[in-house]
């Protein structure tokens, strides 16, 4: 099982989502910024590194928001999603096709990676009424 970390980044009442590039599996599906944990890294170190690589901005890693295991045809992952804040600057599209900030009510308008399904339901249940 591959350890994966991701960031739940809020800006006011909207959270950040990133669209996977055409060149990767699950092309053009939406996801949270993040990636695989490398050997010797803590989860927080991995998340900060992935954010710098993918969006050009580091993050202040907060508490765990959700954890989920998911089996894809090509990989089995354990995804840990952390509450996080951008540590300076605006996100840039260094690896993704697009970056957006959306409200929980806008989730149905986007095709997310299947591993994010339960996490998105938790976001709606905890934050959906605050719009």
Regions found by a protein language model. Name each.
Residues 83, 92-123:
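NUDIX/MutT-family hydrolases
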Residues 58, 66-90, 100, 123:
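Active-site-adjacent beta-strand/loop module that shapes the phosphate/pyrophosphate-binding cleft
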Residues 124-131:
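Generic C-terminal helix-cap and adjacent flexible tail
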Residues 24-29:
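A conserved beta-turn-beta hairpin within the catalytic core of GNAT-like acetyltransferases
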Residues 32-64, 103:
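The catalytic Nudix box helix
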Residues 1-16, 36:
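Conserved N-terminal beta-strand and adjoining loop/helix that marks the start
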Residues 9-10, 17, 86, 101:
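Conserved hydrophobic "DFG−1" position in protein kinase catalytic cores
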């Amino acid at each position: 099982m591959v350890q994966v970390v991701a960031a739940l980044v809020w800006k006011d009442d909207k959270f950040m989502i990133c669209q996977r590039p055409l060149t990767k599996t699950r092309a053009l599906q939406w996801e949270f910024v993040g990636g695989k944990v490398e050997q010797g890294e803590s989860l927080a170190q991995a998340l900060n590194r992935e954010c710098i690589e993918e969006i050009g901005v580091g993050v202040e890693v907060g508490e765990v928001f959700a954890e989920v295991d998911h089996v894809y045809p090509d990989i089995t992952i354990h995804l840990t999603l952390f509450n996080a804040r951008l540590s300076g600057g605006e996100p840039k599209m260094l690896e993704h096709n697009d970056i957006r900030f959306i409200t929980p009510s806008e989730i149905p308008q986007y095709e997310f990676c299947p591993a994010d399904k339960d996490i998105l339901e938790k976001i709606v249940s905890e934050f959906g009424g605050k719009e």
